[in-house]
């Protein structure tokens, strides 16, 4: 019997064995974790805060709800949700990368955000939570780094309660040619140089730019959510489609 050919996937523009990608992505985020928030502000000129604010508003969280902030990294969304759901609610900040979790935990504790937040190291493709557990799941700028996106979306559907809502905030495809050209120039020429200057790591930011280009476009991601079983799926483009917020429900 011949050996089975290993499954392959993309790591930026490179083709790698699927089982290698998680470790390679981990290396990127171990490298950038300490300066992640600074780089977000610098690279997006602070606009990422507006994108995240719109995500929070679209989530419709209420006191007492259970929220999963998946690939939550340094905890920007978790901090907002913690205030909204209150002491009777619960926010779980989950991330596959322990360096990002550590930065997020320290940041939120320094802000006095404790009590209704817990931290879980978890793989989005196989979430370690019971079925029908969360009212809301958000994943912001994390899905493009997942090896098997279909498995991750299915896993999110499983742990959502009936009536629950998934929101995916992710880089996408600009709608207009001029914006695409400007964005490509910025992503591949400017971002790596910023990474080299601020984090001494140009390679990680070159990967991040490539991972954005390899991520499914708006309509493709919408169909992936529908195929997984989500209903009433729609998306909102922001900043000409550089970023899109996809939303779907479990019924």
Curated annotation (Swiss-Prot):
Q: Which EC class heads this enzyme's classification? A: transferase
Catalytic activity reads: a 2-demethylmenaquinol + S-adenosyl-L-methionine = a menaquinol + S-adenosyl-L-homocysteine + H(+); a 2-methoxy-6-(all-trans-polyprenyl)benzene-1,4-diol + S-adenosyl-L-methionine = a 5-methoxy-2-methyl-3-(all-trans-polyprenyl)benzene-1,4-diol + S-adenosyl-L-homocysteine + H(+)
Q: Which residues bind S-adenosyl-L-methionine?
A: 74, 95, 123-124
Pathway per the UniProt entry: Quinol/quinone metabolism; menaquinone biosynthesis; menaquinol from 1,4-dihydroxy-2-naphthoate: step 2/2; Cofactor biosynthesis; ubiquinone biosynthesis
- Tell me which Gene3D superfamilies the record gives: Vaccinia Virus protein VP39 (3.40.50.150)
The entry's family comment says: Belongs to the class I-like SAM-binding methyltransferase superfamily. MenG/UbiE family.
Q: What is this protein called?
A: Ubiquinone/menaquinone biosynthesis C-methyltransferase UbiE
In which organism is this protein found?
A: Shewanella piezotolerans (strain WP3 / JCM 13877)
């Amino acid at each position: 019997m011949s050996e089975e050919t290993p499954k392959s996937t993309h790591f930026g523009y490179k083709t790698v064995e699927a089982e290698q990608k998680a470790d390679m992505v981990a290396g990127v985020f171990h490298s950038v974790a300490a300066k992640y928030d600074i780089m977000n502000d610098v690279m997006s000129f602070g606009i990422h805060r507006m994108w995240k604010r719109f995500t929070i508003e679209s989530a419709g969280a209420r006191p007492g709800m259970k929220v999963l902030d998946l690939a939550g990294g340094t905890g920007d969304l978790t901090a907002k949700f913690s205030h909204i759901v209150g002491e009777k609610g619960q926010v779980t900040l989950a991330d596959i990368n322990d360096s990002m979790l550590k930065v997020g935990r320290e940041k939120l504790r320094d802000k006095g955000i404790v009590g209704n937040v817990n931290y879980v190291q978890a793989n989005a493709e196989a979430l370690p939570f019971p079925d029908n557990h969360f009212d809301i799941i958000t994943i912001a700028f994390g899905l493009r780094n997942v090896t098997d996106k279909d498995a991750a979306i299915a896993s999110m559907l499983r742990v959502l309660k009936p009536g629950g809502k998934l929101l995916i905030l992710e880089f996408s495809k600009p709608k207009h040619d001029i914006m695409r050209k400007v964005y490509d120039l910025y992503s591949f020429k400017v971002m790596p140089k910023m990474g080299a200057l601020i984090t001494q790591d140009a390679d990680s930011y070159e990967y991040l730019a490539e991972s954005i280009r390899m991520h499914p476009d708006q309509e493709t991601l919408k169909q992936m959510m529908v195929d997984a079983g989500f209903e009433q799926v729609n998306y909102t483009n922001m900043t000409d489609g550089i970023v899109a917020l996809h939303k779907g429900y479990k019924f």
